[in-house]
């Protein structure tokens, strides 16, 4: 499963070692390289497209007719921040085997007209929270900027990816001498406390000047931007025996990456395999490129029709389909063991986590849980279970949201991790391998032979 784009020198060395390299470490190194080189959802989707094309997938455009054939593989994007890849078997298909993950993570977005002058000495950037984050870890660390820039080019408007890959801004904390409450549950204000320092006044360099220089364009050609702050600390393998990994955006790019590698490697004979990566999960999914949109439904209908099906055959195929909604889960934290449910206590490095919720925040029920457990057993992948404590409300994720558009059996899963929604998260070195093995087996499984 070595399809990651922009392979680093470190990863090349790992691949050259071949069978001598630990399979778990190898998968984790590929994931870390993917995270380090793709700092925004737009970079992630572009990288996935390159991975798919390298593996023989053909790109489709929503604005054009879907011309597809049996035995071929394709992908389609929306907003350049969501992507659906799919592989069609050589014979008539029975249903759809679908995995879903999301491309976005909590961060700060740079507002329009962002530069603010302070005390006639400094320039700050006006930013706003994106998603529900742990705010404190963003302070006192060098930050970069990444996203997309819309540029006027002749009579056309072009999209350019931007990654300012240097230490360009920072949010310094207020010294303990001026904030004696800092270690007593201080509540950060999202407007006043989190404006990163950008420059000294008198430097005569604006944010748009830097953007224009990075992209090699005229500043006057910049029409608009979607830009986010990025944590510049690289991913790493750590622990006494290299048992753990740490990186930004493990939630949910671990599932994004594992699904992409798995669908490339899978040999699906009975069902159409699809890997969906939606945007905006962290802010409710209610966008044209989110899980609540018609993106998945539109693709399924068009694929079925392009293969000669009608509305009735589409509904039959959906009834024989299954979704794995993959969004990371909370590991028991060694310093906060009381925060976990007393009976369902997943930990890092112990396998895929199946998530349950009595109030239907997750899609898993006895049927879908049984199917996925059986698939994991066949893949020789260990399984754990997660539920919230009964006095803690849980959030919903991709499965239930997408089921409002395409109703089918689904299971919610993820990999156990610590510090979810921090700019730097931790997990187990074995878990990317486990997830890839489980997803590959899922793509290759005839669900109708198990259940319907």
Write out the residue ranges for each language-model feature.
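N-terminal hydrophobic/helix-forming segments and targeting peptides
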Residues: 1-452
């Amino acid at each position: 499963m070595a399809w990651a784009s922009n392979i680093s020198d470190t990863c090349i060395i790992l691949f050259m070692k071949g069978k001598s390299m630990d399979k778990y470490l190898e998968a984790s190194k590929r994931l870390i390289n993917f995270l380090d080189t793709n700092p925004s959802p737009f970079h992630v989707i572009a990288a996935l497209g390159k991975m798919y094309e390298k593996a023989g997938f053909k790109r489709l455009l929503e604005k054009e007719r879907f011309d597809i054939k049996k035995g071929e593989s394709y992908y389609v994007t929306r907003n350049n921040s969501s992507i659906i890849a799919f592989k069609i078997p050589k014979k008539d298909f029975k249903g759809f085997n679908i995995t879903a993950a999301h491309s976005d993570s909590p961060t700060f977005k740079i507002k329009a007209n962002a530069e603010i002058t302070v005390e006639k000495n400094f320039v700050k950037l006006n930013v706003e929270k994106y998603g529900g984050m742990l705010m404190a870890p963003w302070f006192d660390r060098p930050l970069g900027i990444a996203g997309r820039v819309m540029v006027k080019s002749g009579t056309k408007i072009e999209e350019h990816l931007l990654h300012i890959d240097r230490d360009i801004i920072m949010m310094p904390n207020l010294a303990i001498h001026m904030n004696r409450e800092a270690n007593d549950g201080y509540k950060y204000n999202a407007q006043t406390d989190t404006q990163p320092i950008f420059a000294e006044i008198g430097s005569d360099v604006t944010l748009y000047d830097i953007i224009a220089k990075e992209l090699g364009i005229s500043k006057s050609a910049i029409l608009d931007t979607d830009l986010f702050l990025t944590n510049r600390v690289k991913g790493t393998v750590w622990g006494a025996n290299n048992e753990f990994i740490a990186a930004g955006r493990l939630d949910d790019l671990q599932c994004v990456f594992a699904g992409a590698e798995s669908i490339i490697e899978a040999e699906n004979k009975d069902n159409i395999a699809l890997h969906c990566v939606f945007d905006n999960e962290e802010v409710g999914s209610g966008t044209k490129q989110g899980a609540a949109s018609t993106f998945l439904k539109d693709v399924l209908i068009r694929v079925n029709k392009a293969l000669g099906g009608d509305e009735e055959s589409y509904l039959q195929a959906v009834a024989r389909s299954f979704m794995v909604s993959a969004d990371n889960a909370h590991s028991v934290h060694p310093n906060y063991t009381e925060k976990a449910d007393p009976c369902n206590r997943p930990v890092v490095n112990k396998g895929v986590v199946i998530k349950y919720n009595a109030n239907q925040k997750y899609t898993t029920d006895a049927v879908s849980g049984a199917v996925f457990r059986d698939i994991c057993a066949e893949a020789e992948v260990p399984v754990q279970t997660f539920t919230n404590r009964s006095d803690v409300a849980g959030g919903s994720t991709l499965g239930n949201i997408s089921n409002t558009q395409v109703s089918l059996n689904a299971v919610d899963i993820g990999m156990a991790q610590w510090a979810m929604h921090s700019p730097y998260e931790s997990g187990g070195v074995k878990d990317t391998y486990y997830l890839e093995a489980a997803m590959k087996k899922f793509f290759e499984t005839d669900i109708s032979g198990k259940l319907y």
